[in-house]
């Protein structure tokens, strides 16, 4: 969020390590733009695909560690795939968001459009950080939250002063409210905007929508391999982080004990 808001101006400062630095310091072979598409537990191999070239090959393993993390939740709502509706989970997401935002702000500065607007769906930590940074860029921000308060995990008396601060800053809060649909919008401010329909009957016009409604474990690869999942849908591991396959371990946001 803070690079989108240009509080952190240099993109490189977000990257604590690079493939080159990991190779030099720890002799780790890091292959970026590369995806594991299948696990053969019996043969102890993984099928690998290079994203840019489509080339596929296999690698063998003695022990395998699964650290795929989580992916942002995209509810099955009408219009959810509109290009103005984004999630912020990875660097690539950030780049797309910033490119769209920069273009809208540049058009505003050139007098070709009015105020840039954004809707943030979800008032957790990521959602509020995005709201803060969009506001920092001069964007008119509305936040939509299903719970009756922002920051649902904390007590109401902690959330209340933050809500007052946001409203004083001109950020709109739509609490106990959900996004119901996203419709393409073309008007004097641009032809690639989106209309956000709320279940309250309110409609918000936006140049950008950020979905910050939580994450879910990235487990499709694991499911396809027949590895056991837990009750909440994460990879089930024991106290040694072993999965149901004793040769395969898992760690991070995708696991549950």
Residue ranges and their predicted role:
Residues 41, 47-48, 53-116:
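Glycine/serine-rich phosphate-binding loop and adjoining beta1-alpha1 elements at the start
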Residues 31-52, 59, 136-239:
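A Rossmann-like FAD-binding core segment of flavoenzymes
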Residues 1-29, 131-154:
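Beta1-alpha1 glycine-rich phosphate/pyrophosphate-binding loop at the start
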Residues 70-72, 92, 125, 157, ...:
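Residue-level detector of alpha-helix initiation sites
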Residues 62, 69, 122-127, 201, ...:
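Conserved phosphate-binding and hydrolysis motifs of nucleotide-dependent enzymes
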